[in-house]
Amino acid sequence: MYLYNSATHKKAEFLTHTPGRVEMYTCGPTVYHFAHIGNLRSYIMEDVLEKALRYEGYDVNRVMNITDVGHLSSDADTGEDKMVKGAKREHKTVMEIAQYYTDAFFADCKKLNIKRPDVVQPATGCIDEYIKIIEKLMDTGYAYFAGGNVYFDTSRLDHYYVFNDHDEDDLAVGVREGVDEDTNKRNKNDFVLWFTKSKFENQALKWDSPWGVGYPGWHIECSGISMKYNGEYLDLHCGGVDNAFPHHTNEIAQSESYLGHAWCPQWFHVHHLNTSTGKMSKSKGEFLTVSLLEEKGYDPLIYRFFCLQSHYRKALVFTWENLDNAKIAYDKLIARIAALNPENGSVDEASMSVLKEKFQKALDADLNTSLAITTLYDVLKADMNDATKLALLDNFDQVLGLALLSHAEAKRKEAAKTTSASTASGYQITGEGDPEIDALVLKRYEAKKAKNFAEADKIRDDLKAQGIEVADVRGGAVWKRI
């Protein structure tokens, strides 16, 4: 597999420290609010990457943190702890907020068919690990105590900016939140490893440390958790591109200074989900959730399909029209799969090889999910029996996670019910094999039969808005997409 490496700005063959095993780390959510669908784009693509690695035979140990302390409203170690901010907003304790939004996050992940990582570790559970790392950094001169806090000294590094393609507004992290500069820092880019009560008197969560009662900085949490569960050598670090600087930059600085050797060679960054007003952001108060998509009638897997249609290193523009187009494409795909007969032939493994190779090449080409999706249509057009097509689609869906066969089976059952009801009424529906549309056409007929013409006209207009044209014929109706 060849992946783009954000640290080298090149595509290269993905290699691991231990052959056949991948130590993978994912920056998890700060659980002070619901995850928005921009956040979840990153987790969808990281999920596909993990599944692709497993598909290729790797033993993957994927670790994710849950940030429940220490992430301030500015990435420059200023502002209020986001967890405290969330607790105040909802008049609850920090731990109540953390548990509620952690549960909500994983509920969203389940709906999006995102596999739960092998290890999920709240930041508050590894305080001893952070203190151990900070003590060594102090002893070796990489950290200093000032104003009641412990800072990492970036001037000790030969090279600090690892990801030099970050945005200018990311460099001005202390400015963009409208907060005061931290005057205790020796250098502009120094960052806090440990806060004490001298920083925030109202901090809810505090622990004893050699430097006084306090709490860890955001960046040290990921290093400590990864070293505990992934070991000294991390193969693959994932996250949103907005975390490249300063968060991932600081992780590298403190981890390699502590370990005395290179830490993680491969960095996988997923780009932004943008709206008409720019990057989706909780801090701006403008964000969409999975629950909102569901309220508007979208299966969350439509959003997953939407994400997979674009490459992870390209900014993805979200509009309702774009999501509608993804829904139409997904529904058509499911309808075509539903039309396959699982009893038509037996699975022919030999005939799968060419398309399996094409699918594999798409994954190996920097996780080209849009190309991988085209292989689904190649399967449907291939000269092979239906049983083999279904087996191949199921094989590819181990990576894509689109629930293709289960959704197709549900559509078959729905179609059977509609056909049964249509037959019982003597009404013949001819269309493109979409049971949801068939059901609406039948409902329109029943409304007309009951002389509820307003309801019948409303259904016709709703179908037309979806691009469906219905023509009444003797003994039934014919519908088509226009």
Each language-model region and where it sits:
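N-terminal, positively charged nucleic-acid-binding surface of large information/translation enzymes
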Residues: T8-K11, H17-N113, V470, G475-W479
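Structural preference for alpha-helix termini/caps and helix-kink/transition segments
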Residues: K279-S281, F287-I482
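Short, glycine/charge-rich beta-strand/loop segments that flank catalytic centers
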Residues: V63-G70, A98-F105, K115-Y130, G148-L157
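Non-catalytic interaction-recognition regions
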Residues: K92-E96, F106-K132, Y142, A244, ...
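Alpha-helical recognition segments enriched in aromatics with Gly/Pro capping
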Residues: M1-Y32, D47, F106-A107, I127-A339
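Anion (oxyanion) recognition and catalysis
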Residues: R54, M138, K464
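Short, well-structured beta-strand/strand-turn elements
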Residues: D59-N61, G141-G147, D383, E469-A471
